[in-house]
Amino acid sequence: MNILITAVSSSTGPSGICRHAYSLACCAVSRKEISQVTLVVGKWQESYFKHSFQMEDMKLSVVVVDIHNDAFARNLWYLCELPRLANAVAADIIHLSFPVPIRRATLNRPVVVSLHDLYPYDEPDNFGFPKVYFNRVFLQQCLGEVDLVTCVSETTLSRLNTRFPAVAKKKGVVVYNCVNIKSSRHSYSVITDRPFFLMVAQHRANKNITMALRVFGELLKRERIDRRTLLLLLGNHGPETTTIKSVIEREALGDSVKLIDGVSDEELIWLYKSCDILLAPSFMEGFGLPIVEGLLCGSRVVCSDIPTFREVGGEACYYFDLYSDKGSSGLATAICDALTKPKRKAEDLERFSLEEIARNLMTVYFGLQENSIEETNRGETVALHPAGS
């Protein structure tokens, strides 16, 4: 079987979509049933993928798309050029790493899309207006065109069922994100001689980075944490970057907060292993990849008590209530509490392993292929025996 995986997005650095696309490729090449995997990235993503991931597998071919990195050009590529590429590489299945506009009739093969969240509806501030309305249209169009929707968590499937019950019933299945980070791999230090907290998040409203900054600043002022402690924010710049920088300036945190766009997997492993606290105060998430990666590497995780984090983190995390009367003081209390206790041992993380997710994906792919063959055979039968003959 030949799989084509698309990752062409606006991201130029660390993002959940990029890591997800790479993990899909790793799952596919690990299976003997798969003969070829084609991973498609934008020209602006090429350096990040090569720097951050191991891409040497003989079954993996990386195709770099040289177009403008703007929404119109990317969407036009999916609509017009993806069908040509799929034919050129003789793909049996197309796996979209996130929802994009496609025309199923021009693709002539089964298409599956990974659904991470429903942010165009649940977190419109992530996109701004009127852009969010275009994202809603593209999401609906994609969900209507694809053959199957693999939701990255039960929480995401539940949100899909709330918004699009017919799609959830007919096409929705849960295939967790593959967490393909090896804590045993040799790691490289990024920071020396300073304790630090880590937050892995794109600069978007749902990540609640500004609360983390204010709480961190308050802990420093009140000397409830080591005054040398650094808060490292790892993630792509985005709609909230200007606000984040203004909070850093207003709280006089310039020497205590560091923004980083990208690191290699080896550097990321070191950060997870070495941080005093891994922070995730999000309002809403589809999965929570940094939490699972952090737990696999032994991080002490402090996060908001939201359904997705409970689903993936279980009892291994230190939770705080975003909506209690205590407000941000709840996060401060959770941080201080976590620092005084040993790291908790995470359980049931094998459900996110490459082996487990690869098996689940094979079930999805072969099911789609069998359905496609049956539909083709039915079509041929109708053609051979037209009504009234």
Model-identified regions with their sequence ranges:
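Carbohydrate transferase catalytic cores enriched for Leloir-type hexosyltransferases
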Residues: 1-389
